[in-house]
Amino acid sequence: MNTASSMGDHATIGRYETFSYLPPLNREEILEQILYILDNGWNASLEHEHPDRAFEYYWPMWKMPFFGEQDPNVILTEIESCRRSYPDHHVRLVGYDTYAQSKGHSFLVHRAR
């Protein structure tokens, strides 16, 4: 009888933010989450960090936050640019709620290998 989980070894794999127990999101699913961030009126931003330092609270920001950006394809293009520039880093998309002054949404869009 095989009792191995199809999700892998949950005890040794680092978990980060929303969706961490799901398989990696594809391009369309990431686009849906970008639309969710924009539909809520939040400002999107990208952060990246090397896996060795991924559990530190602050991650370096990729460029500037996308203040007022309403085109999800612009954000998706920046995600791809960040992935190419830092292939050995985790990349996280953040939706910042300026009214509550906190993160409204945050998840990994790229997990380093």
UniProtKB/Swiss-Prot annotation:
Molecular function GO terms recorded: ribulose-bisphosphate carboxylase activity
BP GO terms, sorted: reductive pentose-phosphate cycle
Keywords, sorted A to Z: Calvin cycle, Carbon dioxide fixation, Photosynthesis
Keyword Metal-binding included in the entry's annotation: no
Keyword Zinc (UniProt): no
CDD domains in the cross-refs: RuBisCO_small (cd03527)
Coiled coil spans: none
InterPro entries in the cross-refs: RuBisCO_ssu (IPR024681), RuBisCO_ssu_dom (IPR000894), RuBisCO_ssu_sf (IPR036385)
Pfam (any one): RuBisCO_small
Matching PANTHER family: RIBULOSE BISPHOSPHATE CARBOXYLASE SMALL CHAIN 1, CHLOROPLASTIC (PTHR31262)
Record's function text: RuBisCO catalyzes two reactions: the carboxylation of D-ribulose 1,5-bisphosphate, the primary event in carbon dioxide fixation, as well as the oxidative fragmentation of the pentose substrate. Both reactions occur simultaneously and in competition at the same active site. Although the small subunit is not catalytic it is essential for maximal activity.
Family: Belongs to the RuBisCO small chain family.
Note: The basic functional RuBisCO is composed of a large chain homodimer in a 'head-to-tail' conformation. In form I RuBisCO this homodimer is arranged in a barrel-like tetramer with the small subunits forming a tetrameric 'cap' on each end of the 'barrel'.
Oligomer status and interactors: Heterohexadecamer of 8 large and 8 small subunits.
Protein name: Ribulose bisphosphate carboxylase small subunit 2
Lineage, opening ranks: Bacteria, Pseudomonadati, Pseudomonadota, Gammaproteobacteria, Chromatiales
Gene this chain is encoded by: cbbS2
